[in-house]
Amino acid sequence: MKKVIVTGGLGFIGSNLIKILLKKKYFVINIDKVSYSSNFYNVKKFSNNRNYKFFKIDINNDKKILKIFKKYKPNAIFNLAAETHVDRSIDGPESFIKNNILGAFKLLQAFRKFVERYKNSLLIHISTDEVYGDVLTGRSKEEDAYKPSSPYAASKASSDHL
């Protein structure tokens, strides 16, 4: 059975990804630090599923993250863990820098150590369209220049470049 880790799995997108992965018969490990945007209701339907495990861990804790990687040996890791509210980022950018930049860095460092031994795993980092700034016409493309207009967008752009 393939194993997948989802960080930020108590959020809206993360919990829906977990739902899809469980339907496809993956073993899913949900890692979430549990913050203002976490919602246990999102995972209530599958919290007793034998192919689902939840761990309350901050991605800044690279030692615990690496321990989980080594224990479960995931085929893939989806990083959806992030502070996500634009207005909150303006009022207090520090947690966005800590979680979205440093947290992504710590997760990447743990992943680098993990893949030294387990080479067949991949990490998929999830971003946001906010990194492109205000798109007035049409849609943004991946090749477009970054123009973040909030601390949230800047923190996600920074993590993309790691």
Regions found by a protein language model. Give the residues of each.
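N-terminal Rossmann-like NAD(P)+-binding domain of SDR-like oxidoreductases, especially those catalyzing
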Residues: M1-L162
